[in-house]
Amino acid sequence: MKKFFIIGTDTEVGKTYISTKLIEVCEHQNIKSLCLKPVASGQSQFSELCEDVESILNAYKHKFTAAEINLISFNQAVAPHIIAAKTKVDISIGNLKQFIENKYNQDLDILFIEGAGGLLTPYSDHTTQLDLIKALEIPVILVSAIKVGCINHTLLTINELGRHNIKLAGWIANCNDSNIKYTDEQISTIEELSGYKCSTKISQNADYLDFIDLSKILISPEENE
């Protein structure tokens, strides 16, 4: 089973959009996948579920339940550690790690774990999402929304991953805003300064076919278990 932790350079950069497209391409290619959203916030306007959890379940056509993919959820779209403190919920690295590792014995080809926001999103006053990724020891897929500021945010995230010896499996350029100019130039700059070639560039009207090449990279036998 391949395992990947999906993070963004920031919040609202399209992580869940990318996750659902990866799910779609796996489903079309009969690749057995499961995408977890261990920590979620922000209730959907259509149900009692958090919006990101609902989107993932919809991508799977509800063959999984919310409890199978999500451990902790908050109705308010607020930073997890803040709303956790307000509601007296403990976002424990140990509990999250156990929730994720309990899926390792399932018959899956690939396991995605979609994070909450960026790499250093706090879970508490003394822990961040980085601590969970380090505990899991699995590669990261980084999503960057190409816009003003993305070069700095992407390079900072890649540098921090490298500083902690976390493998970057690939990074995705989410070009979902047609008003942004010089997207190719921004992507090239990130590639040149980071040393990591963009795994795939996703346009506003992308479909699952745009993720075929990326899925082949992720499922390749060269990728570490």
Curated annotation (Swiss-Prot):
Q: Name one GO cellular component term.
A: cytosol
Cofactor requirements of the protein: Mg(2+)
**Mostly located where?**
cytoplasm
Q: Which reaction does it catalyse?
A: (7R,8S)-7,8-diammoniononanoate + CO2 + ATP = (4R,5S)-dethiobiotin + ADP + phosphate + 3 H(+)
Q: In which pathway does it act?
A: Cofactor biosynthesis; biotin biosynthesis; biotin from 7,8-diaminononanoate: step 1/2
Matching entries from CDD domains are given as:
DTBS
Q: What GO molecular function terms would the record report?
A: ATP binding; dethiobiotin synthase activity; magnesium ion binding
Q: Which residues does the Swiss-Prot or TrEMBL record annotate as the active site?
A: K37
Binding annotation for Mg(2+): T16, D52, E114
Where does the UniProt annotation locate this protein? Cytoplasm
Under Gene3D superfamilies, the record lists: P-loop containing nucleotide triphosphate hydrolases (3.40.50.300)
Any one of the GO BP annotations: biotin biosynthetic process
The record's keywords, sorted A to Z, are: ATP-binding, Biotin biosynthesis, Cytoplasm, Ligase, Magnesium, Metal-binding, Nucleotide-binding
Binding-site residues, ATP: E12, V13, G14, K15, T16, Y17, D52, E114, G115, A116, G117, N174, C175
Q: Any idea of its EC number? A: 6.3.3.3
**Quick one: which residues bind substrate?**
S41
Family to which the UniProt record says this protein belongs: Belongs to the dethiobiotin synthetase family.
Subunit comment: Homodimer.
**What is this protein's function per UniProt?**
Catalyzes a mechanistically unusual reaction, the ATP-dependent insertion of CO2 between the N7 and N8 nitrogen atoms of 7,8-diaminopelargonic acid (DAPA, also called 7,8-diammoniononanoate) to form a ureido ring.
| HAMAP family with a match to the protein in the record | BioD
Q: Identify this protein by name.
A: ATP-dependent dethiobiotin synthetase BioD
Q: What lineage is on file?
A: Bacteria, Pseudomonadati, Pseudomonadota, Gammaproteobacteria, Thiotrichales
